């Protein structure tokens, strides 16, 4: 026997029509209207791409600085040595070191959101592959987390840089802020992500690149967005 829908679930069902693609500001306003939990939810997006995720040359992996951040402090660990230690600390890194930091992460005493490394210490960091890899934290040159300019990399992350990559279905999942952001902030963050996605489009790709854009909150249902309402050219 099917249980009764909660008051919140009924409200979400009645508010959002899954057959409609909402203008982005209307969709974001709906998310705010449906937010009824007792914590500040994240606002997430799922962007369906037309790529074939089975082909390595079509996979997307990139980063972007969201103009308004994501609404929480990002804990950054930096593997480096020498003068870079002071530079990383001054840039706002939460934990900086080499062997001591290696031990903390290996023993699971510290769980950073982002790990950055200078190239000269990657021989140490690579040993943490079994721990960092599954969590998507292994420093990577393309993602800007292996860098000669440690201070700049830390500042980028602290100022709202997010990393993204497509899943096996060719979908990009990313957080674009908190439900207590104003509508324009959320819209501009979403648009910044889409601009970055366009820049990461495979050179030889043909066809519709961005097929569908949906938004949701941590505990809410998805709302489909009319791509034409965004202030960027989608394809």
Swiss-Prot record:
PROSITE patterns hit by this protein: RIBOSOMAL_L1
Gene Ontology MF, one: rRNA binding
Biological process, per Gene Ontology: regulation of translation; translation
Pfam families per record: Ribosomal_L1 (PF00687)
One GO cellular component term noted in the UniProt record for this chain: cytosolic large ribosomal subunit
Alphabetical list of SUPFAM superfamilies matching this protein: Ribosomal protein L1
Domain of life, per lineage: Bacteria
Sorted UniProt keywords: Repressor, Ribonucleoprotein, Ribosomal protein, RNA-binding, rRNA-binding, Translation regulation, tRNA-binding
NCBIfam families: rplA_bact
Role according to the record: Binds directly to 23S rRNA. The L1 stalk is quite mobile in the ribosome, and is involved in E site tRNA release.
Family of this protein: Belongs to the universal ribosomal protein uL1 family.
Subunit relationships: Part of the 50S ribosomal subunit.
HAMAP family linked to this entry: Ribosomal_uL1_B
Record-given protein name: Large ribosomal subunit protein uL1
